[in-house]
Amino acid sequence: MEANSGGGGGAEGGRAVTGGGGGGGGSDVELVSKTLQVEHKLFYFDLKENPRGRYLKISEKTSATRSTIIVPSSGISWFLDLFNYYVNSEEHELFSKELQLDSKVFYFDIGENRRGRFLKVSEASVSRNRSTIIVPAGSSPDEGWAAFRNILAEIHEASGLFVMPNQVKPSDGQEHLVDDVGAGFIPGHGSQQPSSSEHNVDRTIDSPGQEETGMTGVSKVIRADQKRFFFDLGNNNRGHFLRISEVAGSDRSSIILPLSGLKQFHEVIGHFVEITKDKIEGMTGANVRTVDPPQR
């Protein structure tokens, strides 16, 4: 398998193609495009930019299917670190991981079938159906996960050469890399331990209702025990609102808060934070976690 440069699809024999080029629909501008062939699959990497920001679209294509995940630009370095972990660790040291980025959660799950080992990467968010790509480990040290990692490294490096207009630096602490069961630590990042109540992983995310349209793209997600809470700014024919969605397993419920009540809501939440701060000091969220292996 080889890596190449260009714009469009992959060439025979596993070539990866690089180039800046068109192809972005609407207001999206394509900055970098690469293609990688792993076994019978083609993977397309497209770094794009629009007025809402920059993102990396990774698509997996086989003869019968195509699936896509969308990675925020702030998550490219985390994907690179995670693939480094899977490439460089011994097989018995590999664990499934979970990465939280803004309003999205990405799951990295190790599996094996008759063709060999693979890494399943799934994207889940409150505004998009769950999507999954499956990356074979490869039959030699420079194939599969390693080739995928190398392309992520090239895109990460190239991304730094493009200056985004009105670029806003992510707030400190928005992405953290930790393990919550000890094993599978990824070198080069903090090893802060989250509370034990965060060990269980919920994996089903429902899509929002059709009546809640006009989402602005300003979203956040937090974790508490076995639940996730999604905060999404949006608007409809009644005006602007903040939708707060609670997701636990397959259960999902939402409340819609008009912006006119947001300040009062903030004051009430602040009141309860103040009177309970002695109880919640030291509780921190985890953006990348090790997932307990299934019982066999």
Swiss-Prot record:
Any one GO CC term of the record: cytoplasm
Keywords assigned: Acetylation, DNA-binding, Nucleus, Phosphoprotein, Transcription, Transcription regulation
Modified residues (Phosphoserine): S207
Superkingdom as given in the UniProt entry: Eukaryota
Residues annotated with N-acetylmethionine modification: M1
Subcellular location: Nucleus
UniProt-listed Pfam families: PurA (PF04845)
GO molecular function list: mRNA binding; purine-rich negative regulatory element binding; RNA polymerase II transcription regulatory region sequence-specific DNA binding
UniProt cross-references to Gene3D superfamilies, sorted A to Z: 3.10.450.700
Record InterPro entries: PUR-bd_fam
Renumbered residue ranges of the record's region Disordered: 1-25, 186-214
Subunit structure: Homodimer. Interacts with TCP20.
Family from the record: Belongs to the PUR DNA-binding protein family.
Function recorded in the entry: Transcription factor that specifically binds the purine-rich double-stranded telomeric repeated sequence 5'-AAACCCTAA-3' found in promoter telo boxes.
Protein name: Transcription factor Pur-alpha 1
